[in-house]
């Protein structure tokens, strides 16, 4: 190996080692939005990005493969057909079942492939690189920020490619299909993982999301049972509450304006992947519009707008 290659490898390894040596901000400091927390993430953003790249390169042979084959075959095939011929999008629509007004469910991931996704997240959590947990309404100890707009996000290039594919190929056209008014308010993305554990994470009070559309996917393994942690969706017109339980690999997609709440988890653990879409500078539709006409071929496109740096939390 020549000297330049040796120096490059040494510098790269040093980045990973330096990232692992960083002291994470305390839980209290994060919850209190202490200025030092923001300074920590801003100061080390480049270092952490490089460390994740190096970690992925070093761990490549041990990391599970995550790609489109992790998705449910029926959904994958219907979406592929719609991208080739948008007039076939009805087959995608037929896979989504309305649970309550404005809330739809579908088998999103293949339950037998969830283990690969979970193993990847577990490997990332054990990487020793500072990873920012979600702390919007509450701090979730086992979760991670996933989008490049978020500080402390999971910056491994292979994961980022998969994450972007979920948003561009699947979530955005599906949201446009189910919620016509979302079109044009879906140029920006946001995502995080959460992991609720009994006796650790409290319930999540009723709230709405700062999104045009939210996709929430159950990442539990088929034999990974839990009790409690049901999600309540609130019909603002009738006041009725629909309590739902996610099965492994099932996704719920809804407008961000739909109020919902998570009940306390009483045993076991629950893992979820949450993805948001919204417009530039965090704009969201003011009203629902079931009758808005959008040509199918426009639904199955990827926005050309540049990603901004606005983040909900």
Stretches with model-predicted labels:
Residues 83-181:
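Non-heme Fe(II)/2-oxoglutarate
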Residues 146-158, 198-208, 246, 303-307:
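Short, charged low-complexity intrinsically disordered segments located at boundaries
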Residues 172-297:
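Catalytic core of non-heme Fe(II) oxygenases with the double-stranded beta-helix
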